[in-house]
Protein backbone atom coordinates (compact mmCIF):
# COMPACT_ATOMS: atom_id res chain seq x y z
CA UNK A 1 0.00 0.00 0.00
CA UNK A 2 1.28 3.46 -0.83
CA UNK A 3 0.30 7.02 -0.10
CA UNK A 4 -1.34 8.48 2.99
CA UNK A 5 -3.41 5.96 4.91
CA UNK A 6 -6.53 7.06 6.79
CA UNK A 7 -8.10 5.49 9.85
CA UNK A 8 -11.33 3.64 9.10
CA UNK A 9 -12.43 3.32 12.74
CA UNK A 10 -15.15 6.01 12.49
CA UNK A 11 -16.67 3.89 9.73
CA UNK A 12 -16.84 0.82 11.97
CA UNK A 13 -17.75 2.47 15.27
CA UNK A 14 -19.98 5.11 13.65
CA UNK A 15 -21.80 7.39 16.09
CA UNK A 16 -20.00 5.91 19.10
CA UNK A 17 -16.46 6.57 17.88
CA UNK A 18 -16.11 10.08 19.31
CA UNK A 19 -17.47 9.12 22.73
CA UNK A 20 -15.08 6.17 22.85
CA UNK A 21 -12.13 8.40 21.96
CA UNK A 22 -13.03 11.02 24.57
CA UNK A 23 -13.27 8.36 27.27
CA UNK A 24 -10.12 6.57 26.12
CA UNK A 25 -8.07 9.78 26.25
CA UNK A 26 -9.20 10.50 29.81
CA UNK A 27 -8.58 6.91 30.88
CA UNK A 28 -5.00 6.93 29.58
CA UNK A 29 -4.27 10.01 31.69
CA UNK A 30 -6.08 8.57 34.71
CA UNK A 31 -4.13 5.32 34.49
CA UNK A 32 -0.78 7.07 34.20
CA UNK A 33 -1.46 9.45 37.08
CA UNK A 34 -0.60 6.68 39.55
CA UNK A 35 2.61 5.69 37.77
CA UNK A 36 5.49 6.47 40.20
CA UNK A 37 7.54 7.59 37.20
CA UNK A 38 5.59 10.86 37.22
CA UNK A 39 6.91 11.68 40.68
CA UNK A 40 10.40 10.50 39.73
CA UNK A 41 10.64 12.91 36.79
CA UNK A 42 8.98 15.75 38.69
CA UNK A 43 5.78 15.86 36.64
CA UNK A 44 3.74 15.73 39.87
CA UNK A 45 5.00 16.39 43.42
CA UNK A 46 3.27 13.48 45.15
CA UNK A 47 0.53 10.88 44.89
CA UNK A 48 -2.05 13.31 46.27
CA UNK A 49 -2.19 14.90 42.82
CA UNK A 50 -3.31 11.57 41.35
CA UNK A 51 -5.96 11.21 44.04
CA UNK A 52 -7.20 14.74 43.34
CA UNK A 53 -7.53 13.86 39.64
CA UNK A 54 -9.69 10.85 40.52
CA UNK A 55 -11.80 12.99 42.87
CA UNK A 56 -12.25 15.52 40.07
CA UNK A 57 -13.44 12.87 37.61
CA UNK A 58 -16.05 11.56 40.06
CA UNK A 59 -17.20 15.10 40.84
CA UNK A 60 -17.41 16.05 37.16
CA UNK A 61 -19.89 13.28 36.39
CA UNK A 62 -22.31 14.84 38.84
CA UNK A 63 -21.52 18.52 38.29
CA UNK A 64 -21.92 18.36 34.51
CA UNK A 65 -25.57 17.40 34.87
CA UNK A 66 -26.45 21.08 35.32
CA UNK A 67 -25.83 21.44 31.58
CA UNK A 68 -28.90 19.28 30.88
CA UNK A 69 -31.84 20.95 32.67
CA UNK A 70 -34.42 18.84 30.83
CA UNK A 71 -34.64 15.28 29.57
CA UNK A 72 -32.62 12.32 30.80
CA UNK A 73 -30.05 11.73 28.07
CA UNK A 74 -26.66 13.16 27.07
CA UNK A 75 -25.71 13.73 23.43
CA UNK A 76 -22.33 15.50 23.71
CA UNK A 77 -19.41 13.07 23.37
CA UNK A 78 -17.08 14.32 26.08
CA UNK A 79 -19.89 14.44 28.63
CA UNK A 80 -20.91 10.93 27.62
CA UNK A 81 -17.31 9.85 28.09
CA UNK A 82 -17.24 11.16 31.65
CA UNK A 83 -20.50 9.42 32.52
CA UNK A 84 -19.23 6.21 30.93
CA UNK A 85 -16.07 6.22 33.04
CA UNK A 86 -17.67 7.04 36.38
CA UNK A 87 -20.75 4.83 35.98
CA UNK A 88 -18.67 1.87 34.78
CA UNK A 89 -16.31 2.18 37.76
CA UNK A 90 -19.23 2.53 40.18
CA UNK A 91 -20.85 -0.60 38.77
CA UNK A 92 -17.77 -2.79 38.42
CA UNK A 93 -15.70 -1.86 41.48
CA UNK A 94 -17.80 0.18 43.90
CA UNK A 95 -14.82 2.53 44.25
CA UNK A 96 -17.06 5.56 43.67
CA UNK A 97 -20.17 5.90 45.80
CA UNK A 98 -22.93 8.48 46.24
CA UNK A 99 -22.87 10.14 49.65
CA UNK A 100 -25.55 12.47 51.02
CA UNK A 101 -24.58 15.34 53.31
CA UNK A 102 -26.98 18.03 54.49
CA UNK A 103 -29.53 16.91 51.93
CA UNK A 104 -27.06 17.14 49.04
CA UNK A 105 -25.65 14.23 47.06
CA UNK A 106 -21.95 13.89 46.22
CA UNK A 107 -19.98 11.27 44.30
CA UNK A 108 -17.01 10.29 46.44
CA UNK A 109 -14.01 8.07 45.72
CA UNK A 110 -13.90 5.48 48.50
CA UNK A 111 -10.96 3.40 47.23
CA UNK A 112 -8.34 4.82 44.86
CA UNK A 113 -6.69 1.44 44.21
CA UNK A 114 -10.00 -0.08 43.20
CA UNK A 115 -10.79 2.94 41.05
CA UNK A 116 -7.51 2.50 39.19
CA UNK A 117 -8.42 -1.16 38.62
CA UNK A 118 -11.70 0.02 37.13
CA UNK A 119 -9.85 2.52 34.96
CA UNK A 120 -7.66 -0.30 33.67
CA UNK A 121 -10.63 -2.59 33.03
CA UNK A 122 -12.49 0.01 31.00
CA UNK A 123 -9.40 1.18 29.15
CA UNK A 124 -8.59 -2.39 28.13
CA UNK A 125 -12.12 -2.90 26.84
CA UNK A 126 -12.15 0.37 24.90
CA UNK A 127 -8.79 -0.51 23.34
CA UNK A 128 -10.19 -3.91 22.33
CA UNK A 129 -13.28 -2.30 20.83
CA UNK A 130 -11.13 0.16 18.93
CA UNK A 131 -8.74 -2.55 17.69
CA UNK A 132 -11.54 -4.80 16.48
CA UNK A 133 -13.99 -2.12 15.34
CA UNK A 134 -16.60 -3.80 17.56
CA UNK A 135 -19.64 -1.60 16.96
CA UNK A 136 -22.08 -3.73 18.96
CA UNK A 137 -19.85 -3.69 22.04
CA UNK A 138 -19.33 0.07 21.77
CA UNK A 139 -23.08 0.62 21.49
CA UNK A 140 -23.88 -1.64 24.44
CA UNK A 141 -21.24 -0.11 26.71
CA UNK A 142 -22.04 3.52 25.96
CA UNK A 143 -25.81 2.93 26.01
CA UNK A 144 -25.57 1.33 29.46
CA UNK A 145 -23.16 3.73 31.13
CA UNK A 146 -22.80 6.91 29.10
CA UNK A 147 -26.15 8.22 27.91
CA UNK A 148 -28.75 8.22 30.70
CA UNK A 149 -28.49 9.87 34.11
CA UNK A 150 -30.31 10.21 37.41
CA UNK A 151 -32.79 13.06 36.88
CA UNK A 152 -33.31 13.61 40.63
CA UNK A 153 -29.57 14.24 40.97
CA UNK A 154 -29.70 16.52 37.94
CA UNK A 155 -32.54 18.59 39.38
CA UNK A 156 -30.62 19.01 42.62
CA UNK A 157 -27.41 20.01 40.83
CA UNK A 158 -29.27 22.57 38.70
CA UNK A 159 -30.61 24.23 41.85
CA UNK A 160 -27.19 24.17 43.51
CA UNK A 161 -25.67 25.90 40.49
CA UNK A 162 -28.39 28.54 40.51
CA UNK A 163 -27.63 29.37 44.12
CA UNK A 164 -23.95 29.87 43.21
CA UNK A 165 -24.78 32.12 40.24
CA UNK A 166 -22.33 30.24 38.00
CA UNK A 167 -22.54 30.07 34.19
CA UNK A 168 -23.88 26.87 32.64
CA UNK A 169 -21.01 26.68 30.16
CA UNK A 170 -17.47 27.98 29.95
CA UNK A 171 -14.69 27.86 27.36
CA UNK A 172 -10.95 27.67 27.81
CA UNK A 173 -7.92 28.43 25.68
CA UNK A 174 -5.67 25.40 25.24
CA UNK A 175 -1.91 25.96 25.26
CA UNK A 176 0.81 24.69 22.98
CA UNK A 177 3.62 22.72 24.63
CA UNK A 178 7.03 23.53 23.17
CA UNK A 179 9.85 21.02 23.78
CA UNK A 180 13.12 22.04 25.39
CA UNK A 181 16.41 20.25 25.88
CA UNK A 182 15.04 17.47 28.09
CA UNK A 183 11.76 15.53 28.42
CA UNK A 184 10.74 17.65 31.42
CA UNK A 185 11.82 20.98 29.92
CA UNK A 186 8.53 22.10 28.40
CA UNK A 187 7.47 25.67 27.73
CA UNK A 188 3.75 26.52 27.83
CA UNK A 189 2.53 29.19 25.41
CA UNK A 190 -0.91 30.50 24.45
CA UNK A 191 -0.61 31.62 20.80
CA UNK A 192 -4.34 31.77 19.98
CA UNK A 193 -7.45 33.55 21.13
CA UNK A 194 -10.83 31.75 21.33
CA UNK A 195 -11.85 32.50 17.73
CA UNK A 196 -8.54 31.30 16.28
CA UNK A 197 -8.66 28.20 18.46
CA UNK A 198 -12.14 27.21 17.30
CA UNK A 199 -11.27 27.86 13.65
CA UNK A 200 -8.22 25.65 14.07
CA UNK A 201 -10.43 22.86 15.42
CA UNK A 202 -12.63 23.16 12.34
CA UNK A 203 -9.58 22.61 10.13
CA UNK A 204 -8.45 19.60 12.20
CA UNK A 205 -11.83 17.89 12.51
CA UNK A 206 -13.41 19.00 9.25
CA UNK A 207 -16.57 20.13 11.06
Which residue stretches match the model-derived regions?
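Non-catalytic terminal regions of proteins
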Residues: 99-207
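Residue-identity detector for glutamine
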Residues: 5, 15, 48, 64, ...
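An active-site-proximal "capping" alpha-helix that borders the catalytic cofactor pocket
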Residues: 17-35
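Alpha-helix capping and helix-loop boundary segments enriched in small/acidic/polar residues
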Residues: 11-23, 45, 49, 53
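Long, well-structured alpha-helical subdomains associated
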Residues: 30-129
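Short, small-residue-biased leader/transition segments that mark boundaries at the very start
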Residues: 3, 7-9
